[in-house]
Amino acid sequence: MAIKEIKAEEFNYSPFRLIGKDWLLVCAEADGKANAMTASWGGMGVMWGKNVAFLVIRPQRYTKEFIDGAEGFSLSVFGEERRKMMSYFGSVSGRDEDKLAKADLTPLQDAGRM
């Protein structure tokens, strides 16, 4: 699957659909380890002239520890054909297994891109 970079000013998708129906995959890396989870609560917009995305993540979630310890995080969108994988990321804890490896995903670090 190829990565498609979309500049924020060219982002022409409904955040209501992406977050509420299609879901997002949020991934963060801290201390040499990465973890991801399905995110379905949040929003996108502009605050004080800056493009922003925000997520609401329960404090008990293992992924929140990664986000809190990281300089940033990534948001990815996958097509309907990956719905089962997205459901897996939302139902299994990274405390128990390496979800990225099991889903055959490799995190790429490329700061400042969407």
Where are these regions (language model features)?
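Active-site-proximal mixed secondary-structure blocks
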Residues: 1-114
